[in-house]
Every structure is written in C-alpha cells, then in structure tokens.
A protein has these predicted regions:
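Metal-dependent de-N-acetylase/amidase catalytic core
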Residues: 2-37, 117-261
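Active-site rim/loop-helix segments in enzyme catalytic domains that contact anionic ligands
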Residues: 1-131
C-alpha cells in the first residue's frame, strides 16, 4: 500500500475504535490510574516522565513497577552489585516522589538477567491486578536496534501480562481479573500519539537527576532528551512532547492492524 492508503486506513481504524469507546489519542488524559513498568530504575523517567508528572498533577493515580534491581548500571568497578542495587532503589523512590507517583513496586530480578518466563509474566500480571490501571506503560519490545535483553524481555512480558491479566482462569490465586484499556509503549520507533508535556519537562529532568549514580553518563542524555522532546513537540505544534505507541487491548492479539495505527 502507498503512504496515502496506509494513512487513510489508519484514520479508518481510529474512527472504528472510537465507535466502541477506544480513543487512543485521549488515552493518556482519561486514565484514572496509570502503571509505568520499567526494566530498570530510571526507565520510566526517561521514557514517560513528563506524562507521569502531568497525569499526577491532574489527579490521576500513577504507579511504577521496576522489574530489575539496577545492579549492573555503573561504569565504576569498585562498587558491589548489592551496594549499587540499594543505592538505585533509593534513587528511584526519590525520583518517583518528584513525579507524584503514589507507589513503586519492585520485582527484584538481577539487572541484565531479567528472565523471560511464565513466572515473571504472572508476577507482572499480579501487580496489574492489584493496581487496576486503565493505562499500562512499557518499553516497546519491537524497537529496532534495542541491544539490551532486559528491555526486549520487559516489553514482551508486559505485553503478555497486559493481555493475560484479564483472563479469569489465568493465575486465579493472584486476584480478580483486570483488563487495562490501553498499553502505551515508550522507547518506540513507531509512535502514534504525542503527549504534550510542555510545562512538565523540567519536572521530568528533575526526577532524572535524582538518579545520582547514573549522572556520569546522564548529562548528555538529558540534553538529548530536551532535543527529542522539542522534535516530538513539533509533530503536534507544542513546545515539548513525549512519543508513545498506544494500543487498545483488542489490538494486541491476532490483529495485524496494530502495525498500521
């Protein structure tokens, strides 16, 4: 199909979804609860810190789930993994406070070794059922050139847990089923929604600066994030934005239309 044909089809799919109560453009603004799931401490801030700050400021309950302990995130050989894990946990809790996040959940897997297992998926689904979010955030596991296995596995595990958490016969011992309406992928190369974070970029950067153990390599990233937010903002005519790939639950299984919208 030509670009014009794909664009028309995407508009048609969005219109169809709206008829059934799914408005992906409004998903970040209409959620009562948002759960941001991160492979490591600081990923939610980098990928969606502006959205989390804005949502919290507007009365949305925001939560984080960090899958690993962050114990490999250093270039300094003198620090132990246990010491670094404790430090990064403290930093994450402080950063979450800056963004207005109500609670940070931890699974505690070893950084660099996030397992792609049924057990990990069930643990994520358990938190989804506990928090009952309308919108779940996760790294896009299909982003090209993503070299970190924790990011790829996290995205896949969250996608599966997002789908499975609504099935009553899946892990019934973990609680009542809950079906979030949308999953939003950050770190994505194929965004379909740009969230206006004008007025909240400074809060995002403030939260990131709480990750002091990462500051050695963070300064260039902070500058890059500003440029990235500026470029994303131009897509919707605002100063700063965060790009996301947002999908409703009905498009995450056996329907290739998710690639188009």
């Amino acid at each position: 199909m030509s670009y014009e044909e794909i664009s028309r089809l995407a508009d048609l799919i969005r219109s169809y979804l709206k008829q059934y109560g799914y408005d992906i453009d409004e998903a970040p603004y209409t959620a009562n609860r948002i759960l941001c799931i991160a492979p490591h401490p600081d990923d939610c801030e980098v990928g969606a810190g502006g959205l989390l700050a804005k949502a919290s400021d507007h009365g949305t309950e925001t939560y984080m789930l960090v899958l690993t302990d962050g114990s490999m995130g250093t270039s300094r050989p003198g620090i132990s993994r246990d010491e670094l894990a404790l430090r990064r946990r403290r930093e994450q809790e402080e950063a979450a406070k800056v963004l207005g996040v109500k609670k940070v959940y931890w699974l505690g897997y070893r950084d660099g070794f996030l397992p792609y297992t049924d057990e990990a998926r069930l643990r994520i689904a358990t938190i989804i059922r506990r928090v009952k979010p309308d919108l779940v955030l996760a790294p896009d596991p299909w982003m090209m050139y993503e070299a970190h296995p924790d990011h790829r596995r996290a995205g896949l595990l969250v996608s599966e847990a997002f789908l499975y958490s609504g099935f009553p016969l899946y892990g019934p011992e973990t609680g009542d089923p809950w079906s979030p309406r949308y999953i939003a992928y950050y770190y994505t190369g194929r965004p379909n929604v740009y969230v206006d974070i004008t007025g909240y970029l400074e809060k995002k950067l403030e939260a990131l600066k709480k990750h002091e153990s990462q500051l050695e390599g963070l300064e260039p990233l902070l500058k890059l994030l500003v440029v990235y937010a500026e470029q994303a903002g131009k897509k919707i005519g605002v100063k700063y934005a965060e790009p996301l790939k947002i999908l409703p639950r009905i498009l995450v299984h056996a329907i290739p239309l998710a690639e188009i919208i």
